C-alpha cells in the first residue's frame, strides 16, 4: 500500500513540475 501511495505521489509531483515548465515556456514565448 505505501508503495502505491508513493508511486501516485511521484506521478503527481512529476505532472505538476511538467505543467509548470510548460506554462513557463509558453509565457516566455509570449513575451
UniProtKB/Swiss-Prot annotation:
Q: What is its main location?
A: plastid
Which regions span the lipid bilayer? 4-26
Q: Origin, by domain of life?
A: Eukaryota
Q: Which InterPro entries match?
A: Cyt_b6/f_cplx_su6
Q: Write out the GO biological process terms.
A: photosynthesis
Q: Which Gene Ontology cellular-component terms appear in the entry?
A: chloroplast thylakoid membrane; cytochrome b6f complex
Q: Which UniProt keywords apply?
A: Chloroplast, Electron transport, Membrane, Photosynthesis, Plastid, Thylakoid, Transmembrane, Transmembrane helix, Transport
Q: Which GO terms describe its molecular function?
A: electron transporter, transferring electrons within cytochrome b6/f complex of photosystem II activity
Cystines in this chain = none
Give membrane topology per the record: Single-pass membrane protein
Location in or out of the cell: Plastid, Chloroplast thylakoid membrane
Q: Name one Pfam family in it.
A: PetL
Is Transmembrane helix one of the keywords UniProt gives this record?
A: yes
Q: Which HAMAP family match?
A: Cytb6_f_PetL
Assembly, per entry: The 4 large subunits of the cytochrome b6-f complex are cytochrome b6, subunit IV (17 kDa polypeptide, PetD), cytochrome f and the Rieske protein, while the 4 small subunits are PetG, PetL, PetM and PetN. The complex functions as a dimer.
What's this chain's function? Component of the cytochrome b6-f complex, which mediates electron transfer between photosystem II (PSII) and photosystem I (PSI), cyclic electron flow around PSI, and state transitions. PetL is important for photoautotrophic growth as well as for electron transfer efficiency and stability of the cytochrome b6-f complex.
Which family does the UniProt entry place this protein in? Answer: Belongs to the PetL family.
PANTHER family associated with the record: CYTOCHROME B6-F COMPLEX SUBUNIT 6
Protein name as annotated: Cytochrome b6-f complex subunit 6
Instruction: Tell me the name of the encoding gene.
Output: petL
Amino acid at each position: 500500500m505505501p508503495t502505491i501511495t508513493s508511486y501516485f505521489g511521484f506521478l503527481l509531483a512529476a505532472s505538476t513540475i511538467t505543467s509548470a515548465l510548460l506554462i513557463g515556456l509558453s509565457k516566455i514565448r509570449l513575451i
